[in-house]
Amino acid sequence: MYEFYLKRYAEIYFLVGKLEFLLRKHIVATLRDFAQKYSYGEWHQLIPNTPQNKEAIAAAKIASRGLDFESFLPFSFWRHLFRREYFAGLWVPSLHLAFLGIPNAATKASFKIVCRNMKRANNIRNRVAHFNLINAGDHEEEIATLLWLINAMEEPSG
């Protein structure tokens, strides 16, 4: 039974890692482009100045020793960028551009779907990271949620 769950965990954790990589890559790129276009400083200056965000950025900068601190930001940092209060300030002007696989990504409907799936992905990530077998979810649903986000961030083919 242990090997059964271990294989499921490995599959999910790989997808969480891929999603986190894509979030770092695409969100930073879109925010960096926006910051340059409108003469802001660094991309992270566009992030809401909450205590949680400030702490995450400060800790990442220390851990990274000044090099690519984005790689040291926790998954929850990326997840919290997709909150309803950030629709007008982050999603519409910039973040929707990270989701090339969503037609009409700038819409409120698209934003709500991304928010819901990011919240779910964060819960999946936390469950798997803490090896919580008791609260194992529907494996196929978890895979589908993660793949939806991954596919939404990749350019459509064809």
What are these regions (language model features)?
Residues M1-G158:
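Amphipathic alpha-helical interface elements
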